Amino acid sequence: MSRSETLFANAQKHIPGGVNSPVRAFKSVGGTPLFFKHAAGAYVTDEDDKRYVDYVGSWGPMILGHSHPDVLDAVRSQLEHGLSYGAPTAMETEMADLVCELVPSMEMVRMVSSGTEATMSAIRLARGFTGRDSILKFEGCYHGHSDSLLVKAGSGALTLGVPSSPGVPAAFAKHTLTVPFNNLDAVRDLLAEVGQEVACIIVEPVAGNMNCVPPAPGYLQGLRELCDEHGVVLIFDEVMTGFRVALGGAQAYYGVTPDLSTFGKIIGGGMPVGCFGGKREIMSHIAPLGPVYQAGTLSGNPLAMAAGLTTLRLISRPGFHDELSDYTRRLLEGLQQRADAAGIPFVTTQAGGMFGLYFSEADEIVTFEDVMTSDSERFKRFFHLMLDGGVYLAPSAFEAGFTSIAHGDAELKLTLDAAEKAFAALK
């Protein structure tokens, strides 16, 4: 038995499914999940000392690559001063100032400890601000695991093959309205019928939890206009896209301004962090300024602020995101060329430093239906063939891939060499 197999067997005794987040269990791709013990740069190393080029990046945060020395130094320095105070710190204000500088729509910001907390809090705030109960989300979009958002969700919910989670009361779900992603007419029709009841529309600007589906041309701007027409708060869930597709997030990349935004992953530099924010008019309703309650024991904790501030400053250098996008483009072009040469139907998508891989006959991937008709069985085989070749992809056909600035020519060659062999084996 490999050490990962032994560790997984032991883990299942006291951890449900042997993992602390479902997609890690490899249920979607089969086999034993890898247990990692080290990560540096573009690589992760498992418990059996095999090293892999990593395109998961801890599900998005590691945009600098793993174990960046400046981030580690910042955390070590803060360790000397304590782990958590449960009181305000200067770094929290520095973080808020920097986020508001980098993302112009953010006039005020509240730190939390996860992306789920951020989206949950933003929706509560939108409801409190508008006095309305219903929310509108999109099929296949995932906004964390709070009850009202696990309706027709993506990410792990798709991996499990269930559109919604048991344990979500019907009374909660009835206030969550869903329409297809990238279908502006469906939004228009629904708001024409019940717009006066809808507090907010929450959307991933790039749907990164049904792999990676960019918005159709004009889609985000159309949502902006419909929200303005019906007095609905527009929330961009940028937990995944924030600071990755562009320094100012997807809202800068696509030129559409939301009312509220949520962030996570990169903003913590690998530590557990999230935040939500937006218009001062709306944020002034959050406690202690207003009546909408939100709190957190570890919100704005100094270790996370140290890691996050350092990360955001490093990725702010001119040219950073151009380099990240260029590597991702070269990766996808190389994969497409090798799939075509092998006669394998294959489609890729990209938004900055995130990407999607689909075994599909479709000309392009635009809708949830396009995603669901891709060949997940072929992806399973491809995943394990790439793993054998030293490349770690997300262990699900429904999860986006991520590149980092640590990925370079050597990693690209290794990845494409492994892919060429994998595509040949898939014939």
Curated annotation (Swiss-Prot):
<comment type="similarity">
    <text>Belongs to the class-III pyridoxal-phosphate-dependent aminotransferase family. HemL subfamily.</text>
</comment>
<dbReference type="InterPro" id="IPR049704">
    <property type="entry name" value="Aminotrans_3_PPA_site"/>
</dbReference>
<keyword id="KW-0963">Cytoplasm</keyword>
<dbReference type="Pfam" id="PF00202">
    <property type="entry name" value="Aminotran_3"/>
</dbReference>
<keyword id="KW-0413">Isomerase</keyword>
<dbReference type="InterPro" id="IPR004639">
    <property type="entry name" value="4pyrrol_synth_GluAld_NH2Trfase"/>
</dbReference>
<dbReference type="GO" id="GO:0005737">
    <property type="term" value="C:cytoplasm"/>
</dbReference>
<dbReference type="InterPro" id="IPR015422">
    <property type="entry name" value="PyrdxlP-dep_Trfase_small"/>
</dbReference>
<dbReference type="InterPro" id="IPR005814">
    <property type="entry name" value="Aminotrans_3"/>
</dbReference>
<dbReference type="InterPro" id="IPR015424">
    <property type="entry name" value="PyrdxlP-dep_Trfase"/>
</dbReference>
<comment type="pathway">
    <text>Porphyrin-containing compound metabolism; protoporphyrin-IX biosynthesis; 5-aminolevulinate from L-glutamyl-tRNA(Glu): step 2/2.</text>
</comment>
<dbReference type="GO" id="GO:0030170">
    <property type="term" value="F:pyridoxal phosphate binding"/>
</dbReference>
<comment type="subunit">
    <text>Homodimer.</text>
</comment>
<dbReference type="GO" id="GO:0008483">
    <property type="term" value="F:transaminase activity"/>
</dbReference>
<feature type="modified residue" description="N6-(pyridoxal phosphate)lysine">
    <location>
        <position position="265"/>
    </location>
</feature>
<dbReference type="GO" id="GO:0006782">
    <property type="term" value="P:protoporphyrinogen IX biosynthetic process"/>
</dbReference>
<keyword id="KW-0663">Pyridoxal phosphate</keyword>
<keyword id="KW-0627">Porphyrin biosynthesis</keyword>
<protein>
    <recommendedName>
        <fullName>Glutamate-1-semialdehyde 2,1-aminomutase</fullName>
        <ecNumber>5.4.3.8</ecNumber>
    </recommendedName>
</protein>
<dbReference type="InterPro" id="IPR015421">
    <property type="entry name" value="PyrdxlP-dep_Trfase_major"/>
</dbReference>
<dbReference type="GO" id="GO:0042286">
    <property type="term" value="F:glutamate-1-semialdehyde 2,1-aminomutase activity"/>
</dbReference>
